[in-house]
Amino acid sequence: MKPTVAIVGRPNVGKSTLFNRILNKRVAIVDDVPGVTRDRNFSEAEWCGKQFSLIDTGGYSRTGDTFSAAVLEQSLIALQEANIIILVVDLRTGITDIDLEITELLRKQASEKTVFLAVNKVDNNLMESDAQLFRKLGLSEPYFVSALDGRGVAELLDAVIAHIPEDDAPESDDTVKLTVIGRPNVGKSSFVNAILGQNRQIVTDIPGTTRDAVDSRFKRNGQDFLLIDTAGLRRKAKVDDNIELFSALRTEKAIERCDVAIILLDATQGLENQDLKVINAAAQKKRGMVIAVNKWDLIEKDDKTAIAYEKRLREELRNLSYVPLLFISALTKQRIYKAIDIAYQVWQNRRMKIDTSRLNNLMLNDIKRTPPSSKSGKEIKIKYLTQLATEPPLFGLFAGNPQLIEEHYKRFLERKLREHFGFEGTPIELKFRRK
């Protein structure tokens, strides 16, 4: 298991900037507004060959509002999960009452953990004399850094990895990568929390309360999963500041990273245009998909309600008939684990490799019974098939005049492939080559 390093501190001291500097990429949302990192942001990091998980927490604050209380809870969970803690303070503001509170919190909650003090915004050697003030906090020897330009960060990381033992057993790459997507307030974070069994994300009834995408690992039936929750896709007209824009881009990146997208819909509102955009985003990236209709507990129903609801959805999503659909409630946990099990099956389907002889025995019989035709009258003869790739499954079909094969016949071939081999939840690609 990789050790976990948590970055903590009050709002706007530069925690997310340090997080991004360590990763050498922009992962956490960084803005001048205090409290922008409202949730814990996870990522895998490496320094000098040693790997660790890095957590960027929301800023510790005591303003008394709902979000500050929730962020405090998240920070406490991060302290429990972490093996090593980096406390970030701000040279420009000096030691504040909140810095003292956090220091006391660390003494009580993390007395057995390794704590590093990073004095941020120390932009040159002359400023280091002022930074000596932070020794009064009574923590470890302070490290003077500038997260913005990288000054001193290497020395800090050298000290951090000195406390990380050599990794004897590297993690398996055979991990199912899932992402939970949907428009705002369909219950994505509630779903993640229900699966993980802890309040890993800030959840309120306000749309958009999950700003950053968050990675979480869990096991089910011996299988490793990586679960990525996202900020939700928004209509472009509503992305009216740089924070929301970057969150929307993060959602698209999360789709790129995943194997299977669990797409949440709101049972109380039906299918909306924004839902279609979310679904199309996953389909265009050729990802596996599972549609989970959430808040099913709020629907008045009889024994025919689910059948009628699914029929209506299927009519609106005709091109995605291969995508499994189920009804869930993140609040009551109804069928949430079934959603994970179906996603696992979709993951397996994406990796399925069909033997060439079996493929041709079944498919060439179908092609013989229903041969392709062209408007030009030229003969189109498909001679054989082979699977070229997986994730998603890609099939090569070798034929004479392949450019004349029409779209309706391509759909026929895809339908037959699914009838014979399944491939539920995953797109199939066909590539025609001249023979």
Curated annotation (Swiss-Prot):
Residues that hold GTP 2 according to the record: 182-189, 229-233, 294-297
Positions of GTP 1 binding: 9-16, 56-60, 120-123
Residues of the KH-like domain: 352-435
Residues covered by the EngA-type G domain: 3-168, 176-351
One record GO biological process: ribosome biogenesis
Any GO MF annotation of the entry: GTP binding
PROSITE patterns in the cross-refs: G_ENGA
Alphabetized InterPro entries for the sequence: AAA+_ATPase, G_ENGA, GTP-bd, GTPase_Der, KH_dom-like, KH_dom-like_a/b, P-loop_NTPase, Small_GTP-bd
Keyword terms, alphabetized: GTP-binding, Nucleotide-binding, Repeat, Ribosome biogenesis
Family to which the UniProt record says this protein belongs: Belongs to the TRAFAC class TrmE-Era-EngA-EngB-Septin-like GTPase superfamily. EngA (Der) GTPase family.
Task of the protein: GTPase that plays an essential role in the late steps of ribosome biogenesis.
Alphabetical list of PANTHER family matching this protein: GTPASE DER
Subunit structure: Associates with the 50S ribosomal subunit.
Name used for this protein in its record: GTPase Der
